[in-house]
């Protein structure tokens, strides 16, 4: 959580008043959620997602309370692998020269550590789909090259990715 303090200092340097945040109930709730989750993980990707979520609340780039609650729950329950797969399929890159195939080939091309581990990535995908974060149920349907590079995250998935993204990076886009 020290990283949050450093980033808050950067926000103060850019004009965010920390006194106002100290009185902001939404921000205080976000810090409490993030702190509780952070105490139960050592995974750097999750700690970074928590830091970014709190910072997005601080700068007013967060969804309503109901979505924030869901998003914090997903940060806690999804693995770093889930987060990487979700981000990959927001803008998937296919193998050069691949004219058709399944999304599993895109996954294995971009994440070679998952080659031959269908039992793992199928479960990860099932979790993402059942949470409504991706819009395609199955990784193993044959499709065209254009289909392989089509965005697979849902509107909810995009909102979740934005919530756990560094607000400084989002502002730079």
Predicted regions and their residues:
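Charge-rich, amphipathic alpha-helical segments
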Residues: 1-61
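Long, helix-rich, hydrophobic modules that act as membrane-proximal anchors or helical bundle/coiled-coil regulators
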Residues: 40, 44-173
């Amino acid at each position: 959580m020290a990283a949050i303090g450093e980033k808050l200092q950067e926000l103060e340097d850019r004009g965010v008043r920390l006194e106002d945040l100290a009185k902001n109930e939404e921000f205080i709730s976000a810090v409490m959620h993030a702190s509780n989750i952070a105490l139960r993980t050592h995974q750097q990707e999750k700690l970074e997602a928590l830091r970014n979520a709190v910072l997005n609340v601080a700068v007013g780039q967060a969804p309503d309370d109901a979505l924030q609650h869901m998003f914090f729950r997903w940060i806690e329950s999804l693995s770093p692998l889930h987060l990487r797969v979700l981000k990959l399929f927001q803008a998937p890159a296919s193998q050069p020269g691949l004219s058709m195939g399944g999304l599993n080939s895109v996954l294995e091309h971009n994440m070679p550590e998952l080659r031959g581990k269908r039992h793992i990535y199928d479960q990860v995908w099932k979790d993402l789909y059942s949470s409504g974060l991706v819009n395609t149920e199955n990784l193993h349907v044959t499709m065209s090259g254009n289909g392989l590079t089509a965005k697979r995250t849902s509107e909810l998935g995009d909102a979740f990715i934005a919530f756990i993204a560094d607000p400084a990076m989002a502002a730079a886009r």
